Amino acid sequence: MKNVTDSFLSLGHWSSAGSFGLNTDILATNPINLSVVLGVLIFFGKGVLSDLLDNRKQRILKTIQNSEELGVGAVEKLEKARSRLRKVKTEAEQFLVNGYSDIEREKFNLIKSTSNTLEQLENDKNETLRFEQQRLIYQVRQRFFQQALQRAIGTLNSCLNNELHLRTISANIGMLGTIKEITD
């Protein structure tokens, strides 16, 4: 990034007789300089940002796929539990015909227990998916803001030198003096 900035600054030292050059007077060309800096940031930053987002998207998709695989495992357990429930129901009906009320109670308890287990499995699956999505969204946001801040600091450090800094301070002091004279 510093080489790109240096190449633009070196254009300002060319003679203006029949050639292209940049005016480095910050007060006279502030919109032009800002548009050039923004153009360079957008040009070089969009590739990095799109790569970052693509990588993050792949990670998110992989995590979602893993969560779906866990969900498939939960569905398999659910099917086993349903099969067991059907078996217990069949056995309970046979014992009911024979008049065993204790078996009826066990059937009811097993059905209730299985139903509670199935409901808990479904709730756990949904909670896991929701938690993973929130965690991934938070990580993407944190990484995006961190990289944006690092790029902005790097750009400012590479573009700001002592002379420019002193001229900006002097101009701001002059504006404050003018404002004070107007208010007095």
UniProtKB/Swiss-Prot annotation:
Keywords: ATP synthesis, CF(0), Chloroplast, Hydrogen ion transport, Ion transport, Membrane, Plastid, Thylakoid, Transmembrane, Transmembrane helix, Transport. GO terms for molecular function: proton-transporting ATP synthase activity, rotational mechanism. It comes from the Eukaryota. It is found in: Plastid, Chloroplast thylakoid membrane. The keyword Lipid metabolism does not apply. The keyword Plastid applies. Pfam families: ATP-synt_B. One of its GO terms (cellular component) is chloroplast thylakoid membrane. It is a single-pass membrane protein. The chain crosses the membrane at residues 27-49. F(1)F(0) ATP synthase produces ATP from ADP in the presence of a proton or sodium gradient. F-type ATPases consist of two structural domains, F(1) containing the extramembraneous catalytic core and F(0) containing the membrane proton channel, linked together by a central stalk and a peripheral stalk. During catalysis, ATP synthesis in the catalytic domain of F(1) is coupled via a rotary mechanism of the central stalk subunits to proton translocation. In plastids the F-type ATPase is also known as CF(1)CF(0). Belongs to the ATPase B chain family. F-type ATPases have 2 components, F(1) - the catalytic core - and F(0) - the membrane proton channel. F(1) has five subunits: alpha(3), beta(3), gamma(1), delta(1), epsilon(1). F(0) has four main subunits: a(1), b(1), b'(1) and c(10-14). The alpha and beta chains form an alternating ring which encloses part of the gamma chain. F(1) is attached to F(0) by a central stalk formed by the gamma and epsilon chains, while a peripheral stalk is formed by the delta, b and b' chains. This is ATP synthase subunit b, chloroplastic. It comes from Cuscuta exaltata.
